[in-house]
A protein has these predicted regions:
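Conserved G1/Walker A P-loop phosphate-binding module
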Residues: 1-11, 113-122
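Conserved nucleotide-binding/hydrolysis micro-motifs of P-loop NTPases
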Residues: 2-5, 40-43, 67-72, 100-103
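Conserved catalytic-core segment of NTP-binding enzymes
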Residues: 42-58, 71, 76-83
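Inter-motif core of Ras-like GTPase G domains
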Residues: 9-40, 51-64
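Residue-level preference for alpha-helix termini and adjacent loops
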Residues: 2-4, 15, 23, 29, ...
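Pocket-edge positions in alpha/beta enzyme catalytic cores
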Residues: 8, 12, 97-100
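Short, Lys/Arg-enriched charge-dense amphipathic segments
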Residues: 35, 49-63, 87-89, 113-122
Length: 122
């Protein structure tokens, strides 16, 4: 499950918080952070926190809205728009994705390629 659903004590979650923040702040070779969100769920506070940390680290970001195959094209478009608006994402920072039917795969590969080849410098 995602970090928001992990059944661990609050002190463990706080430890994760400091680990993630430290990693994002100190990992100079980090080229891209991909944050997975379920397109069917309303945007979560923990996702907003993660996106904020990534932005503070000035690392390129991709929010991958997963499970788009679980909704109609119109529903997916509307949900993706809400995610972009809620998190103030540029269009290229948020991609709808389905591992089941492959939608969004080409866009993800483009972003990953730009990140690892240096086209998306900090």
């Amino acid at each position: 499950p995602g970090y928001g659903f992990a059944k661990v004590p609050q002190e463990v979650k706080e430890h994760w918080h400091s680990l993630i923040e430290g990693y994002l702040s100190n990992r100079e070779s980090l080229r891209l952070v991909v944050v997975l969100v379920d397109i069917r769920r309303k945007p979560q506070e923990l996702d907003a926190d993660m996106i904020w940390w990534v932005r503070q680290s000035r690392t390129p970001l991709l929010v991958l809205a997963t499970k788009m195959d679980k909704m109609s094209r119109n529903q997916a478009f509307s949900a993706l728009s809400k995610i972009r608006k809620t998190f103030a994402l540029k269009p290229e920072e948020c991609v709808a994705f389905s591992a089941l039917d492959g939608r969004g795969v080409d866009e993800v590969w483009e972003v990953l390629n730009r990140a690892v080849t240096g086209a998306a410098e900090r």
